[in-house]
Amino acid sequence: MSSSSPTGQIASAADIKQENGMESASEGQEAHREVAGGAAAGLSPPAPAPFPLEPGDAAAASRVSREEGAAAAGAADQVQLHSELLGRHQHAAAAQPPLAFSPDHVACVCEALQQGGNLDRLARFLWSLPQSDLLRGNESLLKARALVAFHQGIYPELYSILESHSFESANHPLLQQLWYKARYTEAERARGRPLGAVDKYRLRRKFPLPRTIWDGEETVYCFKEKSRNALKELYKQNRYPSPAEKRHLAKITGLSLTQVSNWFKNRRQRDRNPSETQSKSESDGNPSTEDESSKGHEDLSPHPLSGASDGVTNLSLSSHVEPVYMQQIGNAKISLSSSGVLLNGSLVPASTSPVFLNGNSFIQGHNGVILNGLNVGNTQTVSLNPPKMSSNIVGNGIAMTDILGSTSQDVKEFKVLQSSAVNSAATTSYSPSAPVSFPGLIPCTEVKREGIQTVASQDGGSVVTFTTPVQINQYGIVQIPNSGANGQFLNGSIGFSPLQLPPVSVAASQGNLSVTPSTSDGSTFTSEPATVQHGKLFLSPLTPSAVVYTVPNSGQTVGAVKQEGLERGLVFSQLMPVNHSAQVNASLSSENLSGSGLHPLTSSLVNVSAAHGFSLTPPTLLNPTELNPDLAESQPVSAPVASKCTVSSVSNTNYATLQNCSLIPGQDLLSGPMTQAALGEIVPTAEEQVSHASTAVHQDFVREQRLVLQSVPNIKENFLQNSENKATNNLMMLDSKSKYVLDGMVEAGCEDLGTDKKELAKLQTVQLDEDMQDL
């Protein structure tokens, strides 16, 4: 029997404890290496755990194991090993690693790594830090963790960090930038494309900043006052600056080119919608003004002519009486009820009142009105030169094609005229009512009207009544009633009542042909109204040098009206009843013409007998120095001709009236040889012999106005002889632009304005012997 001694047992127990301690220590070291290696390896993966297991946890586990071993050993020898076990326990407790740096040191290292841009080292430093209550809530550490999370693309952790802690305002700009950039990056990944400014704005509205990194105050960006003033000045001058101007403005204001462009875009948009931005705008404090897009939508109602000094043409047309508001040519503002106007090449369809304004446009409808030129009545199709225009009729000594290029001075002398006529067939009276009130233009009472003298027709012929033209300042107003059988007179022009001239070789019409020219001799205007009723007018375009027309023979009684006018007024002489075998008496009484003090135009009135068909002979030209009453009929002058035409009239008694004939371009002259008996010379009666003096041309009339005179040879021996070879020479007015030819006789006028009183020519009775024969 052997028994171990107590000392041996104690020694063996001590050896066991020592061995257990060594094993536990080695296990603790291995565990520490494993944890440390795992922590070091955890830095390399792209998405490591944000807070790995700290090394102190392994030390605590080893400490627990050592305590258990020490407790077991102490049970064996509580007395002898008490001090040793206590020392070992203290040694194990001292083995836990303490915090190597203070919180300030950790924050300084984080800031240094952030500023240096070493985000990978910052991430490794953060993983190496132990969990400590001292580091909990450190703002520098949280900011560093947020920056590392953004760098590694762990956006949910970033949002969690930013929303869980209230940061100081000094850190708000950086953290706000991280917030928005993270949102933008997520959206770009989801959409697969870069975001635009609008997309980013919508994301900012969808994901507002948390209050932890935002104080809740919105900052409105505003340019400096100097920059805003420079932008405003350029905006006043030009709302659409060029790129060069934008670059220059950006250089002056210190802004970028994009900022300048956006400012102009926003300002124009605010000005387009002034009702939406009544408050002050972001970039300037001035209320919005009207933009250019709202221009052009102004009121189309008539405006006062006195207030419209920018050369704007105002027209207002009605369906019954057509008052025309006129001003100098410019932009056209038209107010139409049931009318149409063609201005500056733009056609406005019309049903009742087409207007030819200042020779710039032509409109056709129920009433054709050509201001300062020609008036065409109802149901017409005027086309005497189809290849060029739909209306080429000579009026007021100027072809319509010439009027198209006339200046505004030709339009200044508009007159106010009212005309009324009685249709003998239907016995219906057409007369214009009182002048329509012109809003803002002129009251009705300011238009003076002289008395109207109406001469009734004995055999049912038409009676044309003219009132006195009234001049209102430099603007004219024309009133034209919608009458189907009246000849209308506008400023010494001719008017055609129902006349149909379609653009074909032959045109026929069953209606009234009223050609009413104005003539002057001495110091007054004279005019002979004449009509052809229920007749036909045939226009047969020949070669460019001749036009033949035929007027059927019909006996009518023509009455006339005499009027005393204002400045440039009209005095209408009388015409006696005439037929093919009757006598024509057309005279100008001196008492009707003297003392009027009117400025004359250069023309005269002569009645010429006409046949059913006759040709037109080529005209001859007389220079202004040769224009005197003593010129013979057969005196031709070959010279280049001017670009003006004459106004002619044909009556129902087969005679033509010509006046205001100006020179015609030589290449445009049309000639037709007198192959058959066409016209005979006129012999005035010996009752009165009046010396014809040269007349004066008014300065407002065409300066280059001259007369084209044509002599008519003695074709038939039974015609009366012309006495004294006065200025009553046969006249042919012809223009290839107008294709409208009329024969007649006119008295020449000179251009000298210094001539004083002129004697008036009196036309004597014409004896018509027999009818003319057709060509």
From Swiss-Prot:
Residues 216-275 bind DNA. CDD domains: homeodomain. GO terms for molecular function: DNA binding; DNA-binding transcription activator activity, RNA polymerase II-specific; DNA-binding transcription factor activity; RNA polymerase II cis-regulatory region sequence-specific DNA binding; sequence-specific DNA binding. Residues 54-63 have a biased composition (Low complexity). Residues 271-283, 292-301 have a biased composition (Basic and acidic residues). Keywords: Acetylation, Cytoplasm, Developmental protein, DNA-binding, Homeobox, Nucleus, Phosphoprotein, Transcription, Transcription regulation. The modification Phosphoserine is found at S634. Interacts with EYA3; acts cooperatively with EYA3 to transactivate target genes through interaction and nuclear translocation of EYA3 protein. Transcriptional regulator which can act as both a transcriptional repressor and activator by binding a DNA sequence on these target genes and is involved in processes like cell differentiation, cell migration and cell survival. Transactivates gene expression by binding a 5'-[CAT]A[CT][CT][CTG]GA[GAT]-3' motif present in the Trex site and from a 5'-TCA[AG][AG]TTNC-3' motif present in the MEF3 site of the muscle-specific genes enhancer. Acts cooperatively with EYA proteins to transactivate their target genes through interaction and nuclear translocation of EYA protein. Belongs to the SIX/Sine oculis homeobox family. PANTHER family: HOMEOBOX PROTEIN SIX (PTHR10390), HOMEOBOX PROTEIN SIX4 (PTHR10390:SF36). This is Homeobox protein SIX4. It comes from Mus musculus (Mouse).
